[in-house]
Design a protein with these regions (language model features):
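Acidic helix-start/capping segments at beta-turn-to-alpha-helix junctions
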Residues: 83-91
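Helix N-cap/coil-helix junction residues
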Residues: 17, 75-76, 180, 196
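Short beta-to-alpha loop/turn elements within the nucleotide-binding domains of ABC transporters
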Residues: 34, 80, 180
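Short, conserved catalytic-motif segment at the N-terminal edge
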Residues: 2-55, 75, 91-96
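Short, surface-exposed loop or secondary-structure junction motifs
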Residues: 92-248
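Active-site SXXK
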Residues: 6-10, 28, 54-80, 170-175
Length: 248
């Protein structure tokens, strides 16, 4: 039944992919599971099906789900102003040529979901360099939003779409509304009910021995191993990135 899928997945190994791991569920039942290759190519450690992976932007699914759970409880409306809950966003600036001007529109909660708030995705922005330095490398999720609010927007909120830190700010919003750490809220309301006991947003819980090595192909098509030191979204010891911070 799945022989063609087997062959397709194996073809990635022939093209230099170190390994793969795929599970297919239907109506709550695992109907397909296959893993091949290496979780650590250099040390020839084979995939065993128990590895954890950096989910990167797939983390956004959990973040949006967590926020919508709070919406279902009637704790906010999508058309509410973000500044009603996070005052640092009350007087935003917008880039205007070589300068900035005052924003004429407020950021709404719905803009965080739809990537239309006007934020950028510059991980090395001066404000975020300050974030790391001024928090001593702790970098709590709620504090992240305060530093992002210092940065001028790319455009008026709701004016256009731009892939950005919207879901990282949404994670901080979840903390404000729920009164809990973002990762803890997700753990109790999503991970545990779904049986995802090996999933976390909290960097201190990352057992790097169980996380598969990461690779990329450079501009010349050569496979390179990614150093843990350049996982750029992990700003600090307590930062839980709603946009890219889930390990599962």
């Amino acid at each position: 039944m799945f022989s063609e899928l087997d062959d397709f997945l194996d073809s990635f190994l022939d093209r230099g992919t170190p390994g793969y791991d795929l599970a297919v569920f239907h109506k709550g039942e695992c109907v397909y599971r296959r893993f091949r290759g290496y979780s650590d190519y250099e040390n020839k450690i084979p995939m065993n099906g128990k590895e954890r992976y950096n989910l990167y932007s797939c983390s956004k699914v959990m973040t949006a789900t967590a926020a919508m759970m709070l919406w279902e409880r009637g704790l906010f409306r999508l058309e509410d102003k973000l500044s009603d809950y996070m005052p640092e966003f009350s007087e935003m600036k917008v880039r205007d040529g070589d300068g900035v001007r005052a924003a004429t529109r407020p950021i709404l909660i719905e803009h965080l979901f739809t990537m239309t708030a006007g934020f950028d995705y510059e991980h090395d922005a001066p404000e975020l360099v300050d974030f790391r330095r001024e928090t001593g490398g702790v970098c709590k999720t709620r504090d992240f939003a305060k530093y992002i609010a210092r940065r001028p927007l790319l455009f008026e909120p709701g004016e256009m779409w731009h892939y950005s830190f919207c879901h990282d700010v949404l994670a901080a919003f979840v903390e404000v509304i729920s009164g809990e750490r973002f990762g803890e809220f997700v753990r109790k309301n999503i991970f545990l009910p779904c049986g995802m006991t090996d999933s976390t947003f909290y960097p201190a819980e990352w057992d790097h021995e169980t996380v598969a090595a990461q690779y990329r192909f450079n501009e010349n098509g050569v496979r390179e191993r990614i150093s843990k030191d350049i996982i750029f979204y992990n700003f600090g010891s307590e930062y839980e990135s709603g946009g890219a911070g889930c390990v599962s």
